[in-house]
C-alpha cells in the first residue's frame, strides 16, 4: 500500500487544502479545486459536528412550535374557569402568532445571511428564541392586559428567531456537506424536529404525572379550579420553559462556527480566507488564519477575475427574470406552501384531533386522565409516525432521491386525507388514529423533509439563503392559511351541547386537495442527489466529459502541490 502524501501544514488527520492549491494563481481554478475537496471529503466527525450544531437548534425550534397545542389546552383550563377551554379565536391567534413571526424571520434572516454572511447571523436567531421562550414561561396577566395578548406577543418574537433558523441551518449544513451524503446530513438536521416533538410529549407526560394528585380532584376540565388550576398553571410554564434549555446548550457552538467557504469564495471573494476556512472547519477551529498581505492581494485579484456574478438587487431580479429560475423558486415555494397548509393544520391541533376521535376523553374520569391521555396520544403519534418518517428519509434520500420521495409522500397523503375525510363518520376512533399516524409518517418520509432539503441545494450561493427563506416563508404562509382559515372551519354548524367539531370531515377533504396540488408542483423541482451545489445552481455547468477533465486536473494539481508548497516554505 502506498503511503499517502502530506502537504506542508497538514497531517494524517487533517488535510491542508490551502497548501494543496497555493501554487495556483487563477482564483476561479482555486475555487473549483478547493470546493471539489469539500464535495469529495470522506464523511467525518467535522460533518457530525456541523449536523449536531444545526440540529440542536432545530430541536429547540420544533419543541417550541409543537408545544402550542398543549399550551392552548392548559391555558384554557387556567384562564377560562367554568369552561375549561379558550375561545376558538384565542386558540387560533396563539397558534398563528408563531407562524406570523416565522415568516418575518425566514425572509429577514434569509436575506441578511446573504448580505452579512452565514456566521454573522448564526446564533442571533437563537438568542431571540431563548429570550422569548423564558419570557413566555414567566408571563402573567393584569387588569389592563390579557395573558393571551402577552403570550401572542412573545410567540411572535419567538417565531422571528425560529424563522431565521430555517434558512441558516439548511444553508450552513448544505455548504459544509460532502456531496455524497448531503441529503442525509440535511435530513438529519431536519429530523431533530421529530425529536423536539417527542421531547415535548415526554415533558407533558412527566409534568402530568408529577401533578397527578391535584389533577384527579377535578372530574372535568371545566371544574379544574383551586389547587387543580394552580397545578395546570405550573405545568404549562414548565413545559414552555424547558424549551430554552437545548437552545442555551447550542448557543456557544453556533456563535463560534466558521463562515462557510462557499460564501467566502463567491460573495466575499476572499480566496485566501476561504481556503484556510476549509481547514479550520475540519480541525474544529472557528476561523482560518491566512497571511494578511497575501490575502489582500488575492482578494483584489479575485474581484477582477472571478467568473461568478456579484450579488446585487439588479442581478437578483435579472436571475429570477429567467423562466427556468423563476419556475424553480415557484416549485420549492408552492410545494412548501401546500404541504404546510395540511401539516400545520393537523400537527398543531393534535390535542384537538385526539379529542375529536375520542382518544383523550373516552373513559376519562377526571382532568388527570384527560391530560394523561392527551400526552400519551401525542407520544403515540410522534413515536409511531413522525420520528420513523424523519429517519427513513435520512437513510434513503441520497439513494432514492428527493423528487421520488416528495412525489410518493404527496400522493399517499392525498389518499389518506381522502379516506379520513370521506369515510370519517364510518371509521372507528382506533381506525382514525391509525390513519392519522400513517399520515404523520408520510408527511416526514415525504414532502416535510424534502421541502426543507431541496431549497438549500438548488440556488446559487449568492442568493441561496434568501431563496430558501422565501420558500420557507411561503410554507409558513400556508400554515397560517391552514390554521387560520381552514382548521377553524371544523366548528362550523356546532351547537351547544352537541358535536363541537361537526365539519372536521370536510376540513380533512380540503387538506386532501392541497396534497394533490403538491403532486403537481413537484414537477417543477429537479432531482438533486449526488450533484454538487455548483452543478445544481449552474455556477459552473459540467458535462460528464468536463467533470472527468476536472478530476484529472485535480489529481495533477495535488501531485504538484508538495513540490510547490516546499518551494513556498523554503
Curated annotation (Swiss-Prot):
Picking any one GO molecular function of the record gives: phosphate transmembrane transporter activity
What CDD domains would the database entry show? Answer: MFS_PhT
Q: Where in the cell is it found?
A: Cell membrane
**Topology versus the membrane, per the UniProt entry?**
Multi-pass membrane protein
- List all topological domains (Extracellular): 83-95, 142-143, 208-237, 347-374, 425-433, 490-505
- Cytoplasmic-side positions: 1-61, 117-120, 165-186, 259-325, 396-403, 455-468, 527-570
| Compositionally biased intervals (Polar residues) | 561-570
Q: What induces it?
A: Transcription is controlled by the phosphorus-acquisition regulatory system.
- Cellular component terms per the entry's GO annotation: plasma membrane
Q: Which InterPro entries match?
A: MFS_dom, MFS_sugar_transport-like, MFS_trans_sf, Phos_permease, Sugar_transporter_CS
Provide ranges: composition bias, Basic and acidic residues: 547-560
Q: Where is the composition biased (Acidic residues)?
A: 537-546
Q: Which residues form a coiled coil?
A: none
Q: How is its activity regulated?
A: Phosphate transport activity is competitively inhibited by arsenate.
Q: Which PROSITE patterns has this protein been placed in?
A: MFS, SUGAR_TRANSPORT_2
Task: Tell me the null mutant phenotype.
Answer: Impairs growth at low phosphate conditions when pho-4 is also absent.
A single Gene Ontology biological process assigned to it is: phosphate ion transport
Keyword annotations of the record: Cell membrane, Membrane, Phosphate transport, Symport, Transmembrane, Transmembrane helix, Transport
Relate the protein's function as given in its record.
High-affinity transporter for external inorganic phosphate. Acts probably as a H(+)-phosphate symporter.
Q: Which PANTHER family match?
A: SOLUTE CARRIER FAMILY 22 MEMBER (PTHR24064)
Q: Which family does it belong to?
A: Belongs to the major facilitator superfamily. Sugar transporter (TC 2.A.1.1) family.
Query: What's the protein here called?
Result: Repressible high-affinity phosphate permease
The organism is: Neurospora crassa (strain ATCC 24698 / 74-OR23-1A / CBS 708.71 / DSM 1257 / FGSC 987)
Amino acid at each position: 500500500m502506498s503511503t499517502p502524501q502530506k502537504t506542508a501544514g497538514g497531517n494524517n488527520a487533517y488535510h491542508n487544502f490551502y497548501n494543496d492549491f497555493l501554487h495556483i494563481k487563477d482564483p476561479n481554478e482555486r475555487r473549483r479545486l478547493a470546493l471539489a475537496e469539500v464535495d469529495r471529503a470522506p464523511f467525518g466527525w467535522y460533518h457530525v459536528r456541523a449536523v449536531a450544531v444545526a440540529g440542536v437548534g432545530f430541536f429547540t425550534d420544533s419543541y417550541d412550535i409543537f408545544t402550542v397545542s398543549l399550551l392552548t389546552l392548559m391555558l384554557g383550563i387556567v384562564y377560562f374557569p367554568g369552561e375549561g377551554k379558550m375561545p376558538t379565536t384565542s386558540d387560533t391567534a396563539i397558534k398563528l402568532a408563531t407562524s406570523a413571526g416565522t415568516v418575518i424571520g425566514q425572509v429577514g434572516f434569509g436575506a441578511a445571511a446573504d448580505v452579512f454572511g452565514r456566521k454573522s447571523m448564526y446564533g442571533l436567531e437563537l438568542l431571540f428564541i431563548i429570550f422569548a421562550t423564558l419570557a413566555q414561561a414567566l408571563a402573567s396577566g393584569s387588569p389592563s392586559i390579557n395573558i393571551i395578548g402577552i403570550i401572542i406577543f412573545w410567540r411572535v418574537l419567538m417565531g422571528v428567531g425560529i424563522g431565521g433558523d430555517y434558512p441558516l441551518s439548511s444553508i450552513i449544513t448544505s455548504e459544509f456537506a460532502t456531496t455524497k451524503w448531503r441529503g442525509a446530513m440535511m435530513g438529519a438536521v431536519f429530523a431533530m424536529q421529530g425529536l423536539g416533538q417527542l421531547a415535548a410529549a415526554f415533558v407533558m407526560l412527566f409534568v402530568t404525572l408529577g401533578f397527578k394528585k391535584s389533577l384527579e380532584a377535578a372530574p372535568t376540565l371545566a371544574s379544574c379550579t383551586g389547587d387543580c388550576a394552580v397545578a395546570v398553571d405550573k405545568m404549562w410554564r414548565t413545559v414552555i420553559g424547558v424549551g430554552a434549555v437545548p437552545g442555551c446548550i447550542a448557543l456557544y457552538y453556533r456563535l463560534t462556527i466558521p463562515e462557510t467557504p462557499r460564501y467566502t469564495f463567491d460573495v466575499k471573494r476572499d480566496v485566501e480566507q476561504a481556503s484556510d476556512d476549509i481547514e479550520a472547519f475540519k480541525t474544529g477551529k472557528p476561523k482560518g488564519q491566512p497571511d494578511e498581505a497575501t490575502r489582500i492581494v488575492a482578494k483584489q485579484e479575485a474581484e477582477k477575475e472571478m467568473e461568478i456574478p456579484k450579488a446585487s438587487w439588479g442581478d437578483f431580479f435579472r436571475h429570477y427574470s429567467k423562466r427556468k429560475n423563476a419556475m424553480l423558486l415557484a416549485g420549492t415555494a408552492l410545494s412548501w406552501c401546500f404541504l404546510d397548509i395540511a401539516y400545520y393544520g393537523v400537527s398543531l391541533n393534535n390535542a384537538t384531533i385526539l379529542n375529536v376521535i375520542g382518544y383523550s376523553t373516552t373513559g376519562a374520569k377526571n382532568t388527570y386522565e384527560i391530560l394523561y391521555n392527551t400526552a400519551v396520544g401525542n407520544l403515540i403519534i410522534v413515536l409511531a409516525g413522525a420520528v420513523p418518517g424523519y429517519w427513513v428519509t435520512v437513510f434513503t434520500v441520497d439513494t432514492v432521491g428527493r423528487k421520488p420521495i416528495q412525489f410518493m409522500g404527496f400522493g399517499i397523503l392525498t389518499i389518506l386525507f381522502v379516506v379520513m375525510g370521506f369515510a370519517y363518520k364510518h371509521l372507528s376512533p382506533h381506525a382514525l388514529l391509525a390513519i392519522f399516524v400513517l399520515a404523520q409518517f408520510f408527511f416526514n418520509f415525504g414532502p416535510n423533509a424534502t421541502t426543507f432539503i431541496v431549497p438549500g441545494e438548488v440556488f446559487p450561493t449568492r442568493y441561496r439563503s434568501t431563496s430558501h427563506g422565501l420558500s420557507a416563508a411561503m410554507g409558513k404562509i400556508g400554515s397560517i392559511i391552514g390554521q387560520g382559515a381552514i382548521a377553524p372551519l371544523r366548528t362550523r354548524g356546532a351547537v351547544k351541547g352537541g358535536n363541537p367539531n361537526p365539519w372536521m370531515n370536510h376540513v380533512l377533504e380540503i387538506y386532501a386537495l392541497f396534497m394533490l396540488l403538491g403532486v403537481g408542483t413537484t414537477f417543477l423541482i429537479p432531482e438533486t442527489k449526488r450533484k454538487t451545489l455548483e452543478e445544481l445552481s449552474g455556477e459552473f455547468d459540467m458535462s460528464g466529459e468536463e467533470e472527468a477533465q476536472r478530476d484529472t486536473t485535480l489529481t495533477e494539481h495535488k501531485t504538484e502541490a508538495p513540490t510547490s508548497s516546499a518551494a513556498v516554505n523554503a
